[in-house]
Amino acid sequence: MFGYPDPSRRFTMGLGSIVYDVLDDYIVHASFQRYLASERSAALEHLHNLEDLNIYQNSVVIFDRGYYSEDMFRYCVERQHLCLMRLKQNYNIAKKCSGDIITILPYNEKDGTEDIRIRVIEVILNDGTNEYLATNLFDSHISQQMFRELYFYRWPVETKYKELKSCLAIEEFSGAKTTSVLQEFYINVLLSNLSSLIKNQVDEEIQITAKSTNKYRYQANRAFIIGRVKTIVPKILCNLFDLSALDILYKESLRCRSQIMPGRTFRRKKNKAIGR
C-alpha cells in the first residue's frame, strides 16, 4: 500500500500528516498515506474532517510553505476556512508584494471560478530575510507584525512531529500488514493526545499552587508523562491496571516538573542532503 522510495532498497515509507491545535496541544486529525502522496491532498482531508466535526469556524488554519496553491486558497475561501499560508518567494503575488497589499486572483472561465481577494503580507525575520504570507483575513486592525506573530504560532507543530518521532517512536512499526501499521500509527496519536490531556491538567494545577515569590516558573515534564503513558495504557487495555493508574500518574507528574526557560531560540539546521 505505502510504496518504496527506491526499488533497490526494500524498506517501505509513508506520509504522516496532522492538523494540530497549537493552543490546546491536541492533534485534531491525523492521516497516514502512501509514500510520495500529496501533502495538499492530506491537508484537504484534514479540512474535510474539520468541516464534518463543525469545529473550523473562528479558527485559523496555518499552512507552511509548499501548501499554497490557488486551488487550495480558493477552497478555503469557498468553504469559509480562515487561513494563513506561507508563499514561496518565486510566486508572482510574492514578487509583487511590498509591505501589506490586497490583490485579486483573477477568474478562470474554463474552470468556472470567480475573482477572489487575497491579502499578501511581507514579513521581515530577525536575520533580515523576507517571508511572504497569504491570507483571507482582511481586518485592517491586524498588522504585519501581528501576522508575523500569528505565523510563528505554527512552530509547535514541528515539536509535535518531533515528539511523535522521538518520544513515541511512531516510525518504528512492529507489524508488517497494512492494518497493523495503521493501528500502531493511530494508537501513538492517541497516546500523544492523552499525554497532552494529563500535562494540561498538571500545568493548570502547578500554576494555581505556584507562589508569587517563586524565582522560576515550572511546568509538567512532558517526556516523563509520555514514558509513563506508554507503559500504563497497554496494561489498562489488557486489564492489568485499572483507570486509577492515570490518577497516580497525575500525582507523580505534579512532583516531576521542569523549569520553563522563556526566550530560548535555536538556529534551524538546514538539511544538506540532495534529494533523488
Question: Where are the regions that the model predicts?
Answer:
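Two-metal-ion RNase H-like nuclease active-site motif
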Residues: 1
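Single, function-defining residue in the core of a domain
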Residues: 4, 8-276
